[in-house]
UniProtKB/Swiss-Prot annotation:
CDD domains registered for this protein in UniProt: CYCLIN_SpCG1C-like_rpt1 (cd20545), CYCLIN_SpCG1C_ScCTK2-like_rpt2 (cd20546)
Role description: Essential for progression through the whole cell cycle.
Comp. bias regions, Polar residues: 278-314
Keyword Membrane part of the UniProt annotation: no
Subunit text: Interacts with cdc2 protein kinase and with the N-terminal domain of cdk9.
Protein's recorded name: Cyclin pch1
SMART domains found in the cross-reference section: CYCLIN
This protein's record includes keyword Phosphoprotein: yes
Cystines in this chain: none
GO cellular component terms, A-Z: cyclin-dependent protein kinase holoenzyme complex; cyclin/CDK positive transcription elongation factor complex; cytosol; nucleus; P-TEFb complex
Subcellular location as annotated: Nucleus
Phosphothreonine modification, residue list: 300
InterPro entries from the UniProt entry: Cyclin-like_dom, Cyclin-like_sf, Cyclin/Ssn8, Cyclin_C-dom, Cyclin_N
């Protein structure tokens, strides 16, 4: 059993018990199966993209989407990507998260939407009369047992959102633009392994710092040039910098050709051109998403923001989720999963 698996005690109700060190990343089950760390991160991100796209079709609240993503990352602390395809685990995480977060959806609806997203075709027929329906249904019910084991029946998830709202209220008087950018940044962070390396409070602090500089807001600093608000909030400067660097790295791996998009101050959405958004005092970070509210539904062109309704075939998510937009037979989908997992 790997060092990482040992580091997560059964039944832990403490978020910190799910946090590992960077050194332990080389001992994940996937790494021990020969999957390079950068490829593991990309496959994790693909699974999170799948969660978001299916979740938006189901009109799930934001907390349910975030919880599903965290379950997904925790699952692969105990099991390998080589043995469990990220689409299948992602679908199961959605199913469990909807129950835990009191956002229950019918298994039938989850199955149908998972099949449609996996095949990249909203019009494909999936119902109880198709093999694809029963294949996905069986996969979700089977994998749920494995997921429960992986989580040690510890369903409690602490999110960064309350922390960032506290920072915003205390230090910038509930500035709406800061809130939008910080909220979106946290959403994007769920696609990375940040939740495995840093506490929710640290992730929230990174989102707040990024939002401050994105909106050109300068708060007071110490004689050493460090933000006073971090000191008052008892947040580590180095850890915040680590989160920013990690998210930046993920953006570059997923879509190296694109950088941060500027916020359109008129409507709060991102423009289509490239613009810098680097927190100069900390690290270079790219972000590409639109701030959202908890009960919105939709999707943007790269990372998840909940402000549109239907997926676009020209998006980065589309490139990640599938290699074809035509309907596939069940056997074709199985073959695609086997190819992606290898």
């Amino acid at each position: 059993m790997s060092e990482v698996i040992k580091s997560v005690p059964p039944g832990s109700q403490n978020t910190s018990q799910w946090i590992i060190s960077k050194d332990q990343l080389v001992f994940t089950p996937s790494a021990l199966d020969g999957i390079p760390l950068d490829q593991e991160e990309i496959q994790r991100s693909k699974g999170c993209n799948f969660i978001i796209n299916v979740g938006l079709r189901l009109k799930l609240p934001q907390t349910a989407l975030a919880t599903a993503n965290i379950y997904f990352h925790r699952f692969y602390l105990r099991f390998s990507l080589k043995n469990y395809h990220y689409y299948e685990v992602a679908a199961t995480c959605i199913f469990l998260a909807t129950k835990v977060e009191d956002s229950v959806r019918k298994l039938r609806d989850i199955v149908i939407n998972c099949a449609k997203v996996a095949q990249k075709n909203s019009n494909v027929l999936v119902d109880e009369q198709t093999k694809e329906y029963w294949r996905w249904r069986d996969v979700i019910l089977y994998t749920e047992e494995v997921l429960l084991e992986a989580l040690c029946f510890d369903f409690t998830v602490e999110h960064p959102y309350p922390y960032v709202l506290s920072f915003i209220k205390k230090f910038v008087a509930d500035d709406k633009n800061v809130t939008k950018v910080a909220w979106t940044y946290i959403n994007d962070s769920t696609r990375s392994i940040a939740c495995l390396l840093y506490s929710p409070k640290t992730i929230a602090a990174a989102a707040f710092q990024f939002a401050l500089e994105k909106n050109e807001i300068n708060l007071s600093t110490t004689t050493d040039g460090l933000p006073v608000w971090m000191e008052e909030s008892q947040v580590s400067y180095e850890d915040v910098k680590g989160v920013l660097t990690l998210i930046d790295s993920l953006y570059k791996k997923i879509n190296p050709s694109k950088q941060a998009l500027p916020i359109d101050q008129k409507n709060g959405s991102h423009a289509s051109s490239v613009a810098p958004g680097t927190p100069s005092s900390l690290a270079s970070v790219s972000t590409q998403a639109t701030p959202q509210h908890q009960n919105s539904s939709g999707r943007t062109d790269s990372f998840h923001s909940l402000n549109t309704e239907t997926p676009s075939k020209s998006t980065v998510d589309d490139q990640i989720l599938s290699t074809a937009a035509q309907p596939k037979k069940s056997s074709d989908t199985d073959k695609e999963m086997e190819t992606e997992a290898s």
